[in-house]
């Protein structure tokens, strides 16, 4: 247990930050999974809709500081390549 007031505060902040990061990490994983599944099924319309949602959500995570801009661009780019490969 923390002995200093500042250490107690940091412990509280860490708990909040961990919960927030867990939420975004799970959301990112689920969004990516939805796009990949739609692309694997060959459903172009569903894949495009999922890609739009993914693009918006991933860039929102950038603005909140969860992931870096380049990481977001790379993820969206790779998902877009998958969707564009569908005939």
UniProtKB/Swiss-Prot annotation:
One of its GO terms (cellular component) is small ribosomal subunit. One of its GO terms (molecular function) is structural constituent of ribosome. Residues 1-20 are annotated as: Disordered. SUPFAM superfamilies: Ribosomal protein S20. Keywords: Ribonucleoprotein, Ribosomal protein, RNA-binding, rRNA-binding. One of its GO terms (biological process) is translation. The keyword rRNA-binding applies. The keyword Cytoplasm does not apply. It comes from the Bacteria. InterPro entries: Ribosomal_bS20 (IPR002583), Ribosomal_bS20_sf (IPR036510). Binds directly to 16S ribosomal RNA. Belongs to the bacterial ribosomal protein bS20 family. This is Small ribosomal subunit protein bS20. It comes from Campylobacter jejuni subsp. jejuni serotype O:2 (strain ATCC 700819 / NCTC 11168). The gene is rpsT.
């Amino acid at each position: 247990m923390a002995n200093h007031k500042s250490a107690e505060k940091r412990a509280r902040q860490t708990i909040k930050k961990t919960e927030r990061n867990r939420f975004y990490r799970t959301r990112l994983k689920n969004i990516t999974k939805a796009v990949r599944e739609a692309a694997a099924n060959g459903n172009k319309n569903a894949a495009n809709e999922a890609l739009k949602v993914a693009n918006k959500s991933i860039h929102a995570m950038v603005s909140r500081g969860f992931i870096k801009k380049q990481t977001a661009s790379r993820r969206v780019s790779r998902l877009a390549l998958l969707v564009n490969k569908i005939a």
